[in-house]
Amino acid sequence: MSKKTINGLPLHPAISMFKEEVLDNKLTRREFLARATALGATSVAAYSMLGLVAPSAAMAATPKQGGTVKIQMHVLGLKEPRTYDWNELSNFSRGWLEYLVQYNPDGTFEGRLLESWSSNADATQYILNVRKGVRWNNGLKFTANDVARNIEGWCDKSVDGNSMAARMNSLIDPDTGKAAAGAIVVLDRDTVQLNLNAADIAIIPGMAEYTSAITPASYSLETMLSNPVGTGPYLPDGHEVGVKAALVRNTSHSWWDDSAYADRIEFIDYGTEQSASVAGAESDEIDMVYESTGDYIDILDGVSGWQRSSAVTASTIVIRCNQEAEVYKDKNVRRALAMAVNNSDVLELGYDGRGTPAENHHVCPIHPEYAELPAQVVDRDEALAMMSAAGLGDYEHELISIDDDWRRNTTDAVAAQIRKSGIKVKRTILPGSTFWNDWVKYPFSSTNWNMRPLGVQVLALAYRSGEAWNEAAFSNAEFDETLAKALAIANADERRVLMKRLEQIMQDEGVVIQPYWRSLYRHHKEGLLGAAMDPVFQIHPHLLAWS
């Protein structure tokens, strides 16, 4: 008889409540799977509670050992993992730096370097069970001390750009900005206990973020490539920013898992213009693209021997004002810009209608705690009047974006909408190598955001006061206090009451213009396994294989 939980303990009491929410059509199947497995239910048990059979973990075709896989992807300058700010960084280092927990395309959470975990009833204490038999590729054993050390590092708010601190907020002493005394306890070589300062239903999902790669005690950014100690099955074999990077299978390492197939994986950077990727596909220079966007989705459909995969997600783009900029401190200025933009029109013009309109609060209808608000009004006359009342009727706003296909086009569409109101806007388009350096600092710019399983995760990461990724520089005491309460509530209906207020604050304060939620697409060669589009852009090197 199969276990219902990954640790053999009884199911967490909240899981039955989640099941009732599904039956009452208050929670989607995907969100139930995410929340149940985050609280320790096995995937099999979570599916069976809904009367479903879990999909087989086996690949659809038999993978062959060996070969090379060539992937179009931006090759960015490496950073310390907790300061990663783009998925591409993690997809390369994932070859040797692994994760405690993995978020799967079906919405479930799977233990990797953690074998299992459990939570008490009110989600204020977690027990993390380290996977036995794991070794670093230098021969040392992977233990609970490694887990505790990494979590302690995630909690250090003094590290510039450390977004993991936002995810570990319930472990942090607000006075020191570091892990609270007694918050992280090593019980024995294989067990870590987390004692939270407040209930937190998002702690395990936070450990699945691409910024949470597990590093050794000897880690330094300077020796990340020259001395690549990790637990994974690959090693770096060259890394040239903006050009190319590669991984090779580490044949001298006894990896704890046994499913690494490709001998070599190459990441080739063609820049931000996707026409180069199409040329690479047609000339057999690459085997898959990182993402297919815009008109190139249909163009890549026509490449012989290639196939399309897709994922419906809560991925999005936001156009935000940085509220530390003098001109954008006035919320009426920010609201005027939002009032001038018809999000449905931007979806059609910027992303060819491949998604659904959003509502300027960064919480998606697929999030379990989403609260429906009245439709926003587009009133360009009022927008200009508000801007003029703020003394900026003749001011020319500079709207910045990266120079690529869909993000450039979407930002162009937003600028055109604002101009229709009579508000002046000029566009500045930056190459990726420039844009990525200061994406959180621009006064008025657009940024793409990945999905997170819970709406409260997104708001805590992107809009809580003082967080590393708070690119809007938004700081609102009522918002922070309400968010803290919402993060402690497991019941989606109860949390939705607070979420409605959070969404309203986002709109009232004009924090973002959020045009749409987007569907994701990727093309790859037929016969390449492990290459399907992932809802959070993960590429797992150990799953890539030729059939």
Locate the predicted segments by residue.
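N-terminal secretory signal peptides
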Residues: M1-E31, L50, A54
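Periplasmic binding protein-like
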Residues: I71, G139, E291, A416-G466, ...
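N-terminal lobe/hinge region of extracytoplasmic solute-binding protein
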Residues: Q72-A121, E152, V229-G230
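Gly/Pro-rich hinge or "lid" segments in bacterial periplasmic/extracellular proteins
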Residues: N104-T108, A199-E266, T272, D381, ...
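Surface-exposed binding/hinge segments that line
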Residues: M164-A217
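Ligand-site clamp/hinge motif
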Residues: Y219-E222, S252-I299, A415, K424-K426
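Structural transition elements
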Residues: M339, R354-A389, W406-N409
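Long beta-strand-rich cores associated with HINT superfamily self-processing modules
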Residues: R522-S547
